Amino acid sequence: PRLVSSAASDVYKRQPKNLSDTPAYSTYPGKDLQMDYEEGLFIGYRWYDREEIEPLFAFGHGLSYTTFDYSNLRAVPPKGTSSVAAFELDITNSGDVFGKEVVQSYVKVSESKIDRPIKELKKFEKVSLEPGESKKITFELTERDLSFWSETNQSWQVEPAEYIFEVGASAIDIRESTSVWLG
């Protein structure tokens, strides 16, 4: 049973520790009833990553009556016809009660030549596990998942680089990482 409605609790999950930690703080309250939001791609967890600010509750933060172990993250050959990269991991309910976990998959580009977020959420999967139960989760990524918009070429492009795949329970609770070269 929930003690607080999910709608009410969601508000608190996105709260900064300090008002000055918010992206719009430097431009608030605007001028002549006009408020400009200048963070561009760097909204939410992307802003906090770039500014190296730890929010009160990170994007994806949640509570559970049990614990989960993430292990064996590894790159695997993609199975989907449009997939260009894939990886899998094992997740285990290491607690004493049934639980659900949202496994979040983030992608980083090592030494990117373009201005982009430090990491981007690309996939997620909710798993339900009995105590001691394990499941294998596979994430497949398409070219579009790894692309950025090139203003110069007016098209989506994949930057040739080392791509770091991270999985975790929230934007700052990263449990495992692995990498592959794409390009």
What are these regions (language model features)?
Residues 1-2, 35, 153:
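A generic helix-loop boundary/linker signal
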Residues 1-12:
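Single conserved hydrophobic/aromatic residue that forms the stacking wall/gate
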Residues 3, 37-40, 158:
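A generic fold-level signal
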Residues 10-15, 40:
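Extended hydrophobic/Leu-rich segments
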Residues 13-31:
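Internal, active-site/partner-interface "lid" segment
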Residues 20, 42, 51-183:
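Intrinsically disordered, low-complexity Ser/Thr/Gly-rich stretches
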